[in-house]
């Protein structure tokens, strides 16, 4: 049965000039932007008592926004007994270490077998929290740390912290090619113009900022550490492809196998057989949404990336780095 919700909030003075769809995304952060926009277009949003359906309507600050809508029962998602690697847990949050080949949220082509289905099994009460408490996502084959909220207040505050860029997320990756230095990619990301399942750097896309630094050089690859300011879909993968240094194994974004000259058959087979993007969410730091305590978590790099790193390092020690280094 659908749940009737009526929520009210006031537009902040700092939101002066924002589009209505942007303003309500900040005011009602428990819900996804797509869901809020759907409600807006369906006449479920009132501004000072008047129904407004145009997303581009500007707000001035001080308006009272009322949201009257039906929230579909999230029990339509099946609770499934799927193991979770719990790094930390208390009454308000859970931090998990996600393995590869594990989708975070049900969607087209993946109706179950996801992190969300597992959460509903291990924490039945989390069904009362929008999106079962999921605050941010990792791609199916990206491994590493995610924080999940157990309660609506915890989720609301974590989502706001994410929007304000107060959650630090660091990643370890192996990029193809010789990167000489670190830097920053500040390029907007939007849906790919022809490949609708992929993203791309796009002038009219959403702002996206990725910081990166070189951790270790190999002959034809580079181990890097990255930090996200924003969290767009496939952000690191898109930005590294934009730099012409796609991630090892990421064939969707140009990560074709590159074999160092004279490489052993073992290394050649490992590179050609690495069948996921070499990307791991290694560190997560944020203020606890309820207590305010600063928390920091680390997840060890998974075995497949460790083995690849060791093999590339051995190859580099044998042949040496190119003269440019």
Swiss-Prot record:
It catalyses: uridine(1911/1915/1917) in 23S rRNA = pseudouridine(1911/1915/1917) in 23S rRNA. One of its GO terms (cellular component) is cytoplasm. It is found in: Cytoplasm. Keywords: Cytoplasm, Isomerase, RNA-binding, rRNA processing. Its main location: cytoplasm. The keyword Glycosyltransferase does not apply. The active site is at 139. Gene3D superfamilies: Pseudouridine synthase, RNA-binding S4 domain. Residues 18-91 form the S4 RNA-binding domain. GO terms for biological process: enzyme-directed rRNA pseudouridine synthesis. Its EC number is 5.4.99.23. One of its GO terms (molecular function) is RNA binding. It is an enzyme of class 5 (isomerase). Belongs to the pseudouridine synthase RluA family. Responsible for synthesis of pseudouridine from uracil at positions 1911, 1915 and 1917 in 23S ribosomal RNA. NCBIfam families: PRK11180.1, rluA_subfam. This is Ribosomal large subunit pseudouridine synthase D. The gene is rluD.
């Amino acid at each position: 049965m659908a749940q009737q919700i009526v929520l009210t909030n006031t537009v902040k003075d700092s939101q002066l000039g924002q589009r209505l769809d942007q303003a309500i995304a900040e005011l009602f952060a428990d819900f996804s932007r797509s869901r809020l926009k759907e409600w807006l277009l369906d006449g479920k949003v009132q501004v000072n008592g008047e129904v407004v359906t145009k997303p581009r309507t500007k707000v001035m600050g001080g308006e009272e926004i009322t949201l009257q809508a039906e929230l579909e029962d999230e029990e339509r998602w099946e609770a499934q007994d799927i193991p979770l690697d719990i790094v930390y847990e208390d009454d308000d949050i859970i931090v998990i270490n996600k393995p590869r080949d594990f989708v975070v949220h049900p969607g087209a082509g993946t109706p179950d077998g996801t992190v969300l289905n597992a959460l509903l099994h291990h924490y039945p009460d989390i069904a009362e929290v929008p999106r079962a408490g999921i605050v941010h996502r990792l791609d199916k084959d990206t491994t590493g740390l995610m924080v999940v909220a157990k309660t609506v207040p915890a989720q609301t505050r974590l989502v706001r912290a994410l929007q304000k860029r107060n959650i630090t997320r660091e990643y370890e990756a192996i990029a193809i090619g010789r990167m000489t230095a670190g830097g920053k990619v500040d390029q907007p990301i939007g849906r790919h113009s022809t490949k609708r399942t992929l993203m791309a750097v796009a002038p009219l896309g959403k702002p996206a900022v990725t910081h990166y630094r070189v951790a270790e050089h190999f002959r034809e690859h580079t181990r890097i550490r990255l930090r996200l300011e924003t969290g767009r879909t496939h952000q690191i993968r898109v930005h590294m492809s934009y730099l012409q240094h796609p991630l090892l194994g990421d064939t969707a974004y140009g990560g074709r196998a590159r074999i160092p000259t004279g490489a052993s058959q073992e290394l050649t087979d490992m590179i050609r057989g690495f069948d996921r993007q070499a990307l791991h969410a290694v560190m997560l730091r944020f203020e606890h949404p309820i207590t305010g305590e600063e928390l920091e978590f680390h997840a060890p790099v998974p075995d497949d990336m460790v083995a690849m790193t060791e093999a590339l390092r051995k190859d580099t020690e044998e042949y040496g780095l190119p003269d440019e280094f």
